[in-house]
């Protein structure tokens, strides 16, 4: 930007007071030389800074100043400007002084309506200033060097898919012709000479921009206020805003006639003008006149030097404000009326819906009144037919049909009515007459169907029920208690407890019909006292009817209610067993039905106190004689195996049987016996015990002890003569018996593991062992023991495994451990203990 002109005023002279001021206004010279790289700059010298305007410059007469201004030529003729009002744009352009046009145009000196008018240019503009100072070559030959090349750019584009004559892009959406440029006529700003759109732009984008439309509309409306230069009186065209457009726009002016209370009380200080003004609502700001402030004119409104001030031709701000206010008030009134109309229409729709609802309510109420009238007629008809002298008395079946009709057709009214009082007045007399001659023990199912029907008609549902024994809330419960219960109470007082079957059958037939609290009342208040009294009178030594025959049938109905009877029963049975001998099997027949009735603890205590001592005495009297054995006493004891626990039975055998049995075996072996007979005798006694008893560790130890005694006998060479093959037979017997024991143990362990897996205890169902090897593997994982096969090692065709530090093999569900000389079978638990 040029700096030399910054030291001169608008006429090109220096100001004494402002010689040190730098003016940064943009001049025409700056605009013309904006892109001129060769423009000359003048830098202020030290002499110019010291002497200011009195400094001598050699180049004052040689080159023009950068400000584009020349000194006035006083030898030129004087041009006079005629006074008067503002003329047309063309005349004003001719009368303007050429010197004024050469002055730099300041930003604040542009006319207010600058835009569509042309820039005023004079004839004194230097032709040399139409181009840059340094000058540049024309662009006509730009790119002419390419004509001597081989067109590599065009070839590259064609390789990438470009087709000549079509646009760029994947879908050829680019423009074909280059963008055309339109040269502006003068030196004004953009838009100063009208539209600058080219022919290509009009073809590609025929739609007119909204800003251009607004400008055209503004010029059209503005021209209506101007006088036609031709003098013809043409009727002006006005554009109107219809009511529909105003409604569609829905604009609500902020200038409300009745502002909100909290907004109207806001204090607003307006400091936009020369003076501070205070308003007490926002609406007052919008109501103020748009009148220019009376003060010094703006810099843009000051007359230019050498020109007269031009007064505005037509300015009535008060009238314009009033007209605008009337327009806005009218728009507000239209919008408010439209809203009020919409509100009234919505109110009409709402009232129509309310009318429909009220009509439905009225119809419902009329229907309810009609139904209540019909229900009342039916009830009155029932009361009339219940009178003593009626020719057509009401029966229970007809009454049930009437109640069914009430429940089916008039369900809401039936639910809302007082069914208790209705049933008491109508149903109860008929029900009493129906059960008048009923005997429950002879015909236990009499009346079950009719009572079941009345249960569905009279019993309250869960929402209306007030409790199990609230007779005032449930008509059916009251019916059973007041009509049915007296007949049952009367028959129970005459009933004999030893004849329990009719009473049990009667209650089983009615247990699903009568209420639960009534059944509890019958069992607790009527049946149990009778049973308790009968148990006190029972004598097990004299009564021929077993007590369980008339007590146990009550178990499904009474269950834990019979617990108080068990203690006196056990006491009476214990007293009866004081002189009992195991040879009498009647005791077992009397006690066996009570095994599952008494609790396990009480049953075991009863057996240990009253039965086990008798069995011990009987077993102590047993004489073991291999040549002539009497087994009656042994059978009497073994017959109680299911009645007493296994531990109690094993205790009896350890104390009273095995000592004598082992003593007889030792005596037999010391007298040169026949080992085949001993083997048969051993196996015969072992077959007398069940698998459950043989699996007990104490019993196994005793039989293993007998095998050890026999092995020592055949190995000690006692006597001069030894039966041939006796040693081998005893060894084979020992091996076979131990093998059976371990097979049984393995089977038991496998069953326990399967049961645990089925119950969900322990391992998951997917990991349940399918064979004995899987079971051993599972146990090894549980105890963190290494279990793996020994590669290339077998014994009798069986794979050898290492279980920790022990070598084992599995044969038909039995684990064999490698001993010092032979393979010894062992149990799984023993194997785990040895591995640890």
UniProtKB/Swiss-Prot annotation:
Whether Ubl conjugation counts among this entry's keywords is: no
Its cellular-component GO annotations read: catalytic step 2 spliceosome; chromosome, telomeric region; cytoplasm; extracellular matrix; nuclear speck; nucleolus; spliceosomal complex; U2-type post-mRNA release spliceosomal complex
Cysteine pairs forming cystine bridges in this chain are none
Q: Known InterPro entries for this protein? A: G_patch_dom (IPR000467), GCFC_dom (IPR022783), STIP/TFIP11_N (IPR022159), TFP11 (IPR024933), TFP11/STIP/Ntr1 (IPR045211)
Biased-composition ranges, Basic and acidic residues, are 1-13, 54-64, 103-116, 217-231
For the region Required for nuclear speckle localization, give the residue spans: 709-733
Classification via PROSITE patterns: G_PATCH
Q: Which family does it belong to?
A: Belongs to the TFP11/STIP family.
In its UniProt entry, what is this protein called? Tuftelin-interacting protein 11
The gene that this protein is the product of is TFIP11
């Amino acid at each position: 930007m040029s700096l030399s002109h910054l030291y001169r005023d608008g006429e090109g002279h220096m100001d004494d007071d402002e010689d040190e001021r730098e003016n940064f206004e943009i001049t025409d010279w700056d605009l013309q030389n904006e892109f001129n790289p060769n423009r000359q700059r003048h830098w202020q010298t030290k002499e110019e800074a010291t002497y200011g305007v009195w400094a001598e410059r050699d180049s004052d007469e040689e080159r023009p100043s950068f400000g584009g201004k020349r000194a006035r030529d006083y030898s030129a003729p004087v041009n006079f400007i005629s006074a008067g009002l503002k003329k047309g744009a063309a005349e004003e352009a001719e009368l303007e002084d050429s010197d004024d046009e050469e002055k730099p145009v300041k930003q604040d000196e542009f006319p207010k309506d600058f835009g569509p008018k042309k820039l005023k240019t004079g004839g004194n503009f230097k032709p040399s200033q139409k181009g840059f100072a340094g000058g540049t070559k024309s662009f006509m030959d730009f790119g002419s060097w390419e004509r001597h090349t081989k067109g590599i750019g065009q070839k590259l584009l064609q390789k990438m898919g470009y087709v000549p004559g079509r646009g760029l892009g994947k879908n050829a959406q680019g423009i074909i012709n280059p963008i055309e440029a339109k040269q502006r006529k003068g030196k004004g700003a953009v838009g100063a000479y009208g539209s600058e759109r080219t022919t290509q732009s009009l073809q590609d984008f025929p739609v007119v921009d909204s800003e251009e439309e607004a400008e055209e509309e503004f010029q059209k409306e503005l021209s209506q206020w101007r006088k036609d230069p031709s003098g013809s009186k043409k009727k002006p065209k006005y554009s109107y805003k219809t009511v529909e457009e105003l409604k569609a726009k829905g604009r609500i002016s902020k200038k409300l006639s009745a502002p909100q209370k909290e907004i109207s009380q806001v204090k607003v200080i307006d400091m936009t003008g020369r003076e501070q003004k205070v308003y007490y609502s926002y609406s007052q700001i919008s109501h103020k006149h748009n009148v220019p402030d009376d003060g010094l004119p703006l810099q843009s409104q000051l007359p230019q030097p050498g020109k007269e001030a031009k007064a505005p031709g037509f300015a009535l701000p008060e009238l314009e404000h009033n007209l605008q206010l009337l327009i806005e008030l009218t728009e507000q009134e239209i919008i408010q009326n439209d809203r009020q109309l919409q509100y009234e229409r919505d109110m009409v729709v709402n009232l129509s819906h309310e009318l429909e609802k009220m009509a439905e309510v009225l119809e419902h109420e009329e229907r309810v009144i009609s139904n209540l009238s019909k229900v009342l007629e039916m009830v009155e008809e029932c009361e009339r037919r219940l009178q003593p002298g009626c020719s057509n008395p009401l029966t229970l079946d007809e009454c049930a049909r009437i109640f069914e009709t009430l429940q089916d057709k008039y369900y809401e009214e039936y639910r809302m009515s007082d069914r208790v009082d209705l049933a008491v007045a109508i149903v109860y007399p008929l029900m009493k007459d129906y059960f008048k001659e009923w005997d429950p023990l002879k015909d236990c199912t009499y009346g079950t169907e009719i009572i079941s029907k009345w249960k569905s008609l009279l019993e309250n549902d869960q929402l209306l029920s007030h409790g199990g024994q609230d007779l005032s809330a449930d008509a059916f419960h009251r019916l059973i208690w007041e009509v049915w219960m007296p007949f049952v109470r009367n028959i129970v007082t005459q009933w004999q407890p030893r004849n329990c079957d009719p009473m049990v059958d009667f209650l089983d037939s009615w247990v699903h019909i009568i209420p639960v609290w009534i059944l509890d009342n019958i069992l607790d208040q009527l049946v149990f006292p009778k049973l308790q009294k009968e148990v006190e009178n029972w004598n097990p030594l004299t009564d021929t009817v077993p007590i369980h025959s008339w007590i146990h049938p009550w178990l499904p109905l009474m269950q834990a209610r019979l617990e108080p009877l068990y203690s006196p029963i056990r006491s009476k049975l214990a007293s009866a067993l004081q002189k009992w001998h195991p040879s009498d099997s009647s005791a077992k027949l009397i006690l066996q039905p009570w095994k599952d009735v008494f609790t396990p603890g009480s049953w075991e205590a009863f057996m240990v106190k009253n039965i086990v001592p008798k069995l011990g005495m009987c077993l102590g009297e047993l004489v073991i004689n291999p040549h002539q054995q009497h087994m009656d006493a042994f059978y009497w004891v073994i017959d109680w195996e299911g009645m007493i626990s296994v531990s109690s039975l094993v205790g009896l055998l350890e104390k009273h049987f095995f000592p004598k049995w082992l003593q007889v075996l030792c005596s037999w072996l010391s007298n040169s016996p026949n080992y085949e007979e001993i083997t048969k005798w051993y196996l015969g006694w072992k077959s007398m015990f069940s698998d459950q008893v043989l699996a007990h560790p104490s019993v196994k130890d005793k039989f293993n002890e007998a095998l050890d005694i026999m092995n020592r006998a055949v190995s000690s060479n006692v006597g001069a003569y030894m039966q041939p093959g006796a040693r081998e037979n005893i060894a084979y017997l020992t091996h076979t018996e131990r093998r059976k024991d371990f097979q049984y143990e393995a089977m038991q362990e496998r069953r326990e593991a399967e049961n645990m897996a089925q119950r969900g205890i322990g391992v998951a169902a997917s990991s349940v062992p399918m064979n004995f090897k899987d079971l051993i593997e599972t146990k090894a994982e549980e105890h963190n023991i290494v279990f793996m096969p020994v590669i290339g090692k077998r014994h009798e065709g069986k794979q050898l495994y290492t279980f920790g530090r022990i070598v084992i093999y599995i044969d038909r569900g039995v684990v064999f451990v490698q001993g010092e000389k032979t393979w010894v079978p062992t149990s799984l638990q023993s194997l785990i203990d040895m591995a640890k």
